[in-house]
Protein backbone atom coordinates (compact mmCIF):
# COMPACT_ATOMS: atom_id res chain seq x y z
CA UNK A 1 0.00 0.00 0.00
CA UNK A 2 2.87 2.39 0.76
CA UNK A 3 4.38 1.70 -2.64
CA UNK A 4 1.07 2.56 -4.30
CA UNK A 5 0.96 5.88 -2.41
CA UNK A 6 4.47 6.72 -3.63
CA UNK A 7 3.67 5.73 -7.22
CA UNK A 8 0.38 7.67 -7.16
CA UNK A 9 2.25 10.79 -6.00
CA UNK A 10 4.78 10.19 -8.76
CA UNK A 11 1.92 9.84 -11.25
CA UNK A 12 0.32 13.08 -10.08
CA UNK A 13 3.53 15.07 -10.58
CA UNK A 14 4.47 13.35 -13.86
CA UNK A 15 4.02 14.85 -17.30
CA UNK A 16 2.51 12.64 -19.99
CA UNK A 17 4.97 14.06 -22.54
CA UNK A 18 7.96 12.54 -20.73
CA UNK A 19 8.58 9.03 -19.44
CA UNK A 20 8.80 8.27 -15.75
CA UNK A 21 11.81 6.14 -14.80
CA UNK A 22 12.03 3.88 -11.76
CA UNK A 23 14.96 1.61 -10.91
CA UNK A 24 14.14 -1.85 -9.60
CA UNK A 25 16.04 -5.01 -8.67
CA UNK A 26 14.33 -7.83 -10.59
CA UNK A 27 14.87 -11.31 -9.13
CA UNK A 28 14.75 -14.41 -11.30
CA UNK A 29 13.10 -16.22 -8.38
CA UNK A 30 10.13 -13.84 -8.73
CA UNK A 31 9.79 -14.79 -12.38
CA UNK A 32 9.98 -18.51 -11.56
CA UNK A 33 7.28 -18.13 -8.88
CA UNK A 34 4.97 -16.45 -11.39
CA UNK A 35 5.61 -18.94 -14.21
CA UNK A 36 5.43 -22.04 -12.01
CA UNK A 37 2.58 -20.72 -9.90
CA UNK A 38 4.62 -21.70 -6.84
CA UNK A 39 4.34 -18.39 -5.04
CA UNK A 40 1.94 -18.39 -2.10
CA UNK A 41 1.84 -14.61 -2.03
CA UNK A 42 2.52 -11.79 -4.45
CA UNK A 43 6.12 -11.47 -5.52
CA UNK A 44 7.91 -8.14 -5.24
CA UNK A 45 7.74 -7.93 -9.04
CA UNK A 46 3.95 -8.29 -8.96
CA UNK A 47 3.65 -5.74 -6.15
CA UNK A 48 5.56 -3.06 -8.03
CA UNK A 49 3.71 -3.75 -11.30
CA UNK A 50 0.37 -3.65 -9.48
CA UNK A 51 1.41 -0.31 -8.01
CA UNK A 52 2.22 1.09 -11.45
CA UNK A 53 -1.09 -0.14 -12.90
CA UNK A 54 -3.18 1.01 -9.97
CA UNK A 55 -1.53 4.45 -10.03
CA UNK A 56 -2.47 4.82 -13.71
CA UNK A 57 0.86 4.34 -15.46
CA UNK A 58 1.41 2.39 -18.66
CA UNK A 59 4.71 0.50 -18.65
CA UNK A 60 6.51 1.17 -21.95
CA UNK A 61 9.61 -0.95 -21.37
CA UNK A 62 11.79 -2.65 -18.80
CA UNK A 63 15.50 -2.24 -19.52
CA UNK A 64 18.19 -4.30 -17.80
CA UNK A 65 20.93 -2.11 -16.35
CA UNK A 66 24.58 -3.12 -16.12
CA UNK A 67 25.89 -0.91 -13.35
CA UNK A 68 27.63 -3.68 -11.44
CA UNK A 69 29.95 -6.50 -12.50
CA UNK A 70 28.21 -9.49 -14.06
CA UNK A 71 27.98 -12.35 -11.57
CA UNK A 72 27.07 -15.73 -13.03
CA UNK A 73 25.20 -16.99 -9.96
CA UNK A 74 23.46 -13.71 -9.16
CA UNK A 75 19.69 -13.95 -8.85
CA UNK A 76 18.97 -10.28 -9.48
CA UNK A 77 19.12 -7.93 -12.41
CA UNK A 78 18.91 -4.20 -11.97
CA UNK A 79 16.20 -2.87 -14.23
CA UNK A 80 14.87 0.48 -15.33
CA UNK A 81 11.09 0.53 -15.58
CA UNK A 82 10.03 3.07 -18.19
CA UNK A 83 6.43 4.17 -17.68
CA UNK A 84 4.21 6.94 -18.95
CA UNK A 85 1.31 8.81 -17.44
CA UNK A 86 -1.73 7.97 -19.55
CA UNK A 87 -5.50 8.08 -19.38
CA UNK A 88 -6.54 4.46 -19.83
CA UNK A 89 -10.20 3.96 -20.61
CA UNK A 90 -10.23 0.91 -22.87
CA UNK A 91 -11.10 -2.53 -21.57
CA UNK A 92 -10.50 -5.77 -23.42
CA UNK A 93 -11.49 -9.38 -22.86
CA UNK A 94 -8.89 -11.92 -21.83
CA UNK A 95 -9.29 -13.63 -25.21
CA UNK A 96 -8.79 -10.27 -26.94
CA UNK A 97 -5.68 -9.61 -24.86
CA UNK A 98 -4.21 -12.99 -25.84
CA UNK A 99 -4.94 -12.23 -29.52
CA UNK A 100 -3.20 -8.84 -29.23
CA UNK A 101 -0.22 -10.52 -27.52
CA UNK A 102 0.04 -13.13 -30.29
CA UNK A 103 -0.20 -10.44 -32.98
CA UNK A 104 2.05 -7.70 -31.51
CA UNK A 105 4.53 -9.34 -29.16
CA UNK A 106 6.60 -11.22 -31.80
CA UNK A 107 7.26 -7.95 -33.67
CA UNK A 108 8.22 -6.19 -30.44
CA UNK A 109 10.56 -9.06 -29.52
CA UNK A 110 12.13 -9.08 -32.99
CA UNK A 111 12.96 -5.38 -32.61
CA UNK A 112 14.18 -5.83 -29.06
CA UNK A 113 16.46 -8.77 -29.82
CA UNK A 114 17.89 -7.13 -32.94
CA UNK A 115 19.35 -4.54 -30.54
CA UNK A 116 21.63 -7.23 -29.07
CA UNK A 117 20.24 -7.88 -25.58
CA UNK A 118 22.47 -10.20 -23.50
CA UNK A 119 21.10 -13.69 -22.89
CA UNK A 120 21.12 -13.00 -19.14
CA UNK A 121 18.88 -9.95 -19.63
CA UNK A 122 16.45 -11.30 -22.24
CA UNK A 123 13.84 -12.42 -19.73
CA UNK A 124 13.32 -9.03 -18.13
CA UNK A 125 13.63 -7.08 -21.39
CA UNK A 126 11.10 -9.33 -23.14
CA UNK A 127 8.77 -9.03 -20.17
CA UNK A 128 8.80 -5.25 -20.62
CA UNK A 129 7.55 -5.70 -24.19
CA UNK A 130 4.63 -7.80 -22.97
CA UNK A 131 3.86 -5.38 -20.17
CA UNK A 132 3.65 -2.53 -22.67
CA UNK A 133 0.67 -4.37 -24.17
CA UNK A 134 -0.94 -5.32 -20.85
CA UNK A 135 -0.73 -1.87 -19.26
CA UNK A 136 -2.30 -0.03 -22.20
CA UNK A 137 -5.69 -1.31 -21.01
CA UNK A 138 -7.56 -0.13 -17.95
CA UNK A 139 -8.88 -3.64 -17.30
CA UNK A 140 -8.76 -7.06 -18.92
CA UNK A 141 -12.05 -8.85 -18.35
CA UNK A 142 -12.14 -12.62 -17.80
CA UNK A 143 -15.01 -14.79 -19.11
CA UNK A 144 -16.63 -14.82 -15.64
CA UNK A 145 -16.62 -11.00 -15.46
CA UNK A 146 -13.70 -10.75 -13.03
CA UNK A 147 -10.54 -8.87 -13.95
CA UNK A 148 -7.25 -10.45 -14.95
CA UNK A 149 -4.67 -10.04 -12.19
CA UNK A 150 -1.11 -8.98 -12.84
CA UNK A 151 -0.08 -12.52 -11.85
CA UNK A 152 -2.28 -14.06 -14.55
CA UNK A 153 -1.19 -11.47 -17.12
CA UNK A 154 2.47 -12.23 -16.40
CA UNK A 155 1.80 -15.93 -16.92
CA UNK A 156 0.16 -15.21 -20.28
CA UNK A 157 3.05 -12.96 -21.30
CA UNK A 158 5.65 -15.57 -20.26
CA UNK A 159 3.76 -18.22 -22.23
CA UNK A 160 3.84 -16.08 -25.39
CA UNK A 161 7.54 -15.29 -24.89
CA UNK A 162 8.29 -19.01 -24.48
CA UNK A 163 6.35 -19.82 -27.66
CA UNK A 164 8.30 -17.11 -29.49
CA UNK A 165 11.67 -18.58 -28.45
CA UNK A 166 10.49 -22.14 -29.15
CA UNK A 167 9.52 -21.04 -32.67
CA UNK A 168 12.95 -19.43 -33.20
CA UNK A 169 14.71 -22.58 -31.96
CA UNK A 170 12.63 -24.75 -34.31
CA UNK A 171 13.39 -22.47 -37.28
CA UNK A 172 17.11 -22.51 -36.49
CA UNK A 173 17.02 -26.30 -36.20
CA UNK A 174 15.33 -26.53 -39.62
CA UNK A 175 17.91 -24.16 -41.13
CA UNK A 176 20.73 -26.26 -39.70
CA UNK A 177 19.21 -29.47 -41.09
CA UNK A 178 18.85 -27.92 -44.57
CA UNK A 179 22.50 -26.84 -44.52
CA UNK A 180 23.66 -30.35 -43.62
CA UNK A 181 21.78 -31.98 -46.53
Residue ranges of model-derived segments:
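S-adenosyl-L-methionine-dependent nucleic acid methyltransferase catalytic domains
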Residues: 1-181
